[in-house]
């Protein structure tokens, strides 16, 4: 093995307390294990959370039977719930959260939980609002590090 590279033993499960990263998946809400149970000697990562579904007519892989972990009727509902999820990450930082990855950047096949549509033509939430939410979260993480 190359000792200059971090090892993620298993993304999402089957943890054997080896490797450098403990990568947990939780849907839809971001959660971390109780401190002291997992990850005492590992980097804690929320490798997947979110999965908020909003199909956009004319921009899906298929017309029916699309899904997300939680479904919404319009962009405003989606943005309100997404904002809540991002805000829920802040209290996890003092518990050791080092990274969080939203599922997912774009819709894929039957999953409509992307920030943008399958064809990449429509952002489901205003980019400026996403930038603002993410910057606020980043700034809170920097404050916790000091």
Q: What kind of region is each of these model predictions?
A:
Residues 135-146:
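Surface beta-strand/loop "capping" patches
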Residues 128-129, 139:
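Extracellular/luminal recognition modules and glycoprotein regions
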Residues 1-122, 132, 143:
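Substrate-binding/catalytic cleft of secreted carbohydrate-active enzymes
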């Amino acid at each position: 093995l190359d000792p200059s590279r971090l090892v993620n033993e298993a993304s999402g499960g089957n943890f054997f307390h080896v490797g450098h990263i403990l990568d947990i998946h939780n849907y839809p809400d971001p959660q971390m294990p109780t401190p002291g149970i997992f990850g005492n000697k590992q980097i804690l990562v929320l490798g997947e959370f979110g999965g908020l579904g909003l199909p956009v007519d004319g921009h899906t892989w298929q017309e029916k039977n699309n899904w997300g972990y939680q479904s919404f009727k319009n962009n405003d509902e989606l943005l309100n719930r997404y904002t809540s999820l991002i805000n829920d990450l802040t209290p996890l930082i003092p518990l050791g959260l080092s990274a969080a990855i939203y599922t997912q950047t774009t819709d894929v096949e039957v999953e409509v939980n992307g920030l943008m549509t399958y064809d990449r033509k429509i952002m489901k939430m205003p980019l400026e609002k996403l930038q603002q939410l993410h910057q606020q979260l980043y700034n809170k993480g920097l404050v916790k590090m000091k």
